[in-house]
Amino acid sequence: MLIRVGYDIRFETDRPTPMLALLSLHPSRHHDLRTPHRIVASPDIPMFEYADSFGNVVSRFTLPPGGLDLSCDFVVEDSGEPDPVVSDAAQHAVEDLPEDVLVYLLASRY
């Protein structure tokens, strides 16, 4: 199935404000894009991208005083099937989890 994805977001500020935004399709799904994926900023500002430790695309920019509009509109193809569920997966108490998975339980700084 084809899914149209998009957003229009407005930010308002009275001073320059550095910002990180995770508003992009995950790179693992780029092969499913049927139209270009491009974030449009108005007014036009420099925007830089990097990949975080999970492979997500992070947009880095500074909001100008006054306001900024971000928009994106694209089409992605998807099977429509739900993610697989492991019906016999065990539930573990937090205190029994291995240390290497605790990072996924930490709160975001934002």
Regions found by a protein language model. Name each.
Residues M1-E81:
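Intrinsically disordered, low-complexity N-terminal segments that are enriched in acidic
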Residues D69-Y110:
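Acidic low-complexity segments
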